[in-house]
Amino acid sequence: DTWKLRLLIRRWYTFLNMQKKVVPQLDNLVTVSRASRQDIATDFDIAETKLDIVHNGIDTRVFRPIPAIERDEFNVMATASADAPLKGLDYLIRAISILAGEIPELKLTVLGKLKEDGKTAKLVSQLGLENRIHFYSGLSSQEVAELYAKATCAVVPSIYEGFGLPAGEAMACGVPVISTNGGALPEVVGDAGITVPTRDHLALADAIRTLLADSNLRHTLAAKGRSRILELFSWEVAAGEMVQLYREVVSREVAR
């Protein structure tokens, strides 16, 4: 595994060095969020004004509420690569550990593959949460939407997200969301979810506790989340933004 990791790191830096040579030569650049625009401008030493934003699209026909599926009470859901540090899953697991003594029925459903003998597996075992945390991988988008339909709430514990598809997909499914303020997540969630600081398992536990105890708040956030995605982040909206950008670029070129 060590040599594979080194190879991946080498490839990443080769790609990054290539990008740093190419980017300054481009007249028009597009990224998916204000947070990404700021980071790219800083890392590549270019003006933010050179970067346009077209948000990622979410398929709201697949990721949608499914009333026919009954929600499981006290079922928290997360999408996170188990051993990817930036996804912050370890903080959520520690939050679940805190709440386990208060809520006997509490369980965590994770969309992600658990690596045997990985850090996450060891943490789950160390905290005695093997029967509370269930990992799923290799699912279709429809199967993911069906899992969301069973969830009481969704949590995005990421330390950084360039956009935040997990939050957007959960919101599109009508699931109330708790997310960190990492990267672009506040742009996606807005006021349609509960936002907490990154790397703070105590804040995550407090937010989960609050949401599980308040059905009115869950219903309010679920409705606001679905509406926000339809208004700002559907594929129809993303396509329209991209078409408009193409028109602006063509107009600028013609005017030269």
Regions flagged by a language model, labelled:
Residues 8-29:
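Membrane-proximal helix-turn-helix segments that form the acceptor-binding/catalytic region
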Residues 35, 57:
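Carbohydrate-associated surface elements
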Residues 69-87, 93-96:
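Conserved donor-binding/catalytic core segment of Leloir-type glycosyltransferases
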Residues 120-142:
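Nucleotide-activated donor-binding/catalytic signature segment of Leloir-type glycosyltransferases, i.e.
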Residues 138, 146-151:
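Short alpha-helical donor nucleotide-sugar binding micro-motif in glycosyltransferases
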Residues 159:
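Aromatic "clamp/platform" in nucleotide-sugar-dependent glycosyltransferases that forms part
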Residues 176-179:
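Short hydrophobic beta-strand element within catalytic cores of glycosyltransferases
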Residues 194-201, 210-215:
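Conserved acidic donor-binding segment of nucleotide-sugar-dependent glycosyltransferases
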